[in-house]
Amino acid sequence: VADRTAICPGTFDPPTLGHIDVIRRAATMFDHVVVAVVRAPQHKMQPVFTADERIALLEDGLADLDNVRVRSFTTLIVDVAREEGATVLVKGLRAVSDFEWEFQMAHLNAELAPELETAFVMSYPDWSFVSSSGVREVAAFGGDVSKYVTPRVARELAAKFPQPSES
């Protein structure tokens, strides 16, 4: 049986414990998992973290997994999947609202690359409400995000959003 490679694409700005959980679960299902960080998201505002910072944050949170590698991309994800020899695209789903968008993308990717399957991994209830945008918002106002991200991500978010001292 040939090795099976999956690709987990995303913006990961910042990576949350929900992202880490989905990637860890994918790592138990596939021989190799490539986490693909989009360099310049087309549909989002300017990322808080650079692509290289997001890669480093993911590598830190996944350092104990020998079968996971993190890289960036600037092309179609189906082209990255072909380049990596991936046969499955793994996407995490938190709620029905995620499904609507991911369902459309899965069909579009199937048109572009019929050989690439999309597999949805349901988030655990602990992470179903956690989003990168929500974490950024809490961090921007000085809130505690330590329950939602790794310690390194929490530190780096605090550095990105220094809080003015009250006088």
Task: Mark where each language-model region is.
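Nucleotidyltransferase catalytic core that binds NTPs
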Residues: 1-167
